[in-house]
Structure formats: C-alpha cells, structure tokens
C-alpha cells in the first residue's frame, strides 16, 4: 500500500447504519459514503430516509446510499432490514449501530418503567439483536467491522440522564464482549462515545441559552460539536486505518470527560 489515503478507502464496502437519517447518524453515514462505501440509511420514517439517501447521492455524485426504514425496537423489522440490505447490496461489511432514544430527563429514581424499558430495549437490546443477525456472514468471510454509538455519558454520572448513561455503559460491555468473542474471526468491534453535538436529539443540552453556556464552558474546546465533525471518525473506525483496534471506546467530546 503506497498511499496513506488508501487506508481510509471504503470503496465497494457495504455499510448498514441505523439511526442515520438525521443528526450524528447522518454525518456518520455521509463519511462512509464519501469514503466509497455503499450505505444503507435507516430510521423509523421512510420519507426522511429517502430524502437523506438522495442528498448523500447528490453530494458524492453517484448512487451509494439507499433507504430502508426500520424501527430498531422490533426484532422482525431488524431482521427485514438485514435481509433487504443483503439482497440489494450484498453481504454487510460494516455495521454502524447509531439508533438510540432518551424519552426521560430527570432523576433515575423517578423514571417510569415504560421509559426505562424503552431506553434499554432501543439502546442495548436492539444492538444485541442486530449484531446476532449480521455476525454469521462476517464470521463466514472472516472479516467485518461493528461500531456501536455509546456516549461520553457512559463515563460520567448524571442527575438528569442517569438511565440513558446506564444504557450507554451497557453498550460498552456489549462491545468488549463481542470484540473478545469474535476477534479470532478478524471482526473488529468498537464504540464511538460522542459528547454533546448540535443535533435535534441533544437540543435540550445545547439550545438553552443560559444552561448551554455553562455546559460549553466545561468542555476543553469551549464549544459543542458539529455533526459533520464525525464524518472522519466514522471512516477511521470502519477502515483499515483502525485495523489493529478492537474492544475500544473512542471518546469524541471536545475534551469534556478529560476535565470532569
């Protein structure tokens, strides 16, 4: 390999991304497509998925993105997502699990059972399910990459986002166990742990003028992240540039956890 940029080339790879129609997930999918991968855009709303796929194709100048809607909380929809990806694009080389929810802000002592179950089902169990579905093909070809979006919240206690943080800490355990189980099959599994980015999902954390100013002051870079800043991160984790990295948690939060 004579050119360093070849390490980041994903040409011909099939990447299935969940929670990728807007926000951070979209930026992650954009990065993969820019690097040459064929990308599945997936979230609950079909029209938004189609729009995102079309805009990514316009951006890269060719048809690299397709839309397959899916609610990851339902096992049968995940199975259809995996099967349709395989039938339309081929075996999955890269699985990027980004879908997540947080329907509750407040003390974990007050969270209703329904909200707790929804967080754990979407943020943890769905990742377990889809990995089970994708791994057989990766094992057969002895090659594959899985990335699960966790959070810097997995490393910090929270008085308002406690249950969400618990789910993201569980994702780290899932990543490490999958990495340990499947390393002998040349399957790498890592976690991406972002901080606060300017997305609709995190708007309550950055869109409150007084509170957001205080929060930004706690970040080493003194600002919140822009979704586009995750494009290169997604490519690194999915590419040969990270070929000797597995079972790790890559924190991308502007230095917030470092100074907690």
Please give the residue ranges for each predicted region.
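Conserved glycine-rich cofactor-binding loop
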Residues: 14, 19-23
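Substrate-binding pocket helix/loop in short-chain dehydrogenase/reductase
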Residues: 106-108, 112-117, 215
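Active-site helix of classical SDR
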Residues: 131, 167, 175
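Short C-terminal tail/terminal secondary-structure segment
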Residues: 2-6, 102-105, 156, 235, ...
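Residue(s) in the substrate-gating loop at a strand-loop-helix junction
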Residues: 151
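Active-site loop-to-helix junction immediately N-terminal to the catalytic Tyr of the SDR YXXXK motif
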Residues: 111, 157-165, 177
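Alpha-helical segment proximal to the catalytic Tyr-Lys
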Residues: 136, 180-184, 243
